[in-house]
Amino acid sequence: MDLLPFLLDANLSATNPPAIPHWWKRQPLIPNLLSQELKNYLKLNAKEKNVQIADQVIIDESAGEVVIGANTRICHGAVIQGPVVIGANCLIGNYAFIRPGTIISNGVKIGFATEIKNAVIEAEATIGPQCFIADSVVANQAYLGAQVRTSNHRLDEQPVSVRTPEGIIATGCDKLGCYIGKRSRLGVQVIILPGRIISPNTQLGPRVIVERNLPSGTYSLRQELIRTGD
């Protein structure tokens, strides 16, 4: 089950939805107002939740509730600032930082010292260590290697626009990340510029910078090694 359709503004649930979900038009995350279908899917109300929370985990609910699904493990040193929803059978790694507005689906793995802010992480996605994922969507079964960065702010401080099949959309958002399609695989230190879309089943080699929307395919940098000192 995809989370994003449950989180979009009501007017985006029409019979003819856009080809690319307008992920920046999410409703504010209020965990106790999620639909019962979504709560059941994420196993938020399971009778035996068996959630494992290690020592020195900080859960801050001063700005919103933090709800965790069954059989999820939160490792040593992680910080979670509500409102946040984490589904069932997830692993939140050591010193991960989960910031407000984030909703994480079932079976997700978050690596060491990764920071996630105001993002939707769909089922069975894997996000490696030391990543920064902000104002973005990571779709089902996507894999992000270490130190992947989603840029969410333009240097000229202008609102972020998104190029879609319907045309260029002025989102009005000062901060907006990217949409990473299902089963995409991103190598170490990939950087995605604000408002970009990566199509499903795309593979990006290490250190690729995503400056434009990418159709499905395999991409890598061309490298030239020069031997010197002889």
Swiss-Prot record:
Keyword Manganese: no
Keywords: Acyltransferase, Repeat, Transferase
GO molecular function: acyltransferase activity; nucleotidyltransferase activity
InterPro entries found in the cross-reference section: GlmU-like, Hexapep, Trimer_LpxA-like_sf
E.C. number(s) listed in UniProt: 2.3.1.-
Family the entry assigns: Belongs to the transferase hexapeptide repeat family.
PANTHER family: N-ACETYLMURAMATE ALPHA-1-PHOSPHATE URIDYLYLTRANSFERASE, NUCLEOTIDYL TRANSFERASE
Protein name, per record: Uncharacterized acetyltransferase YaiX
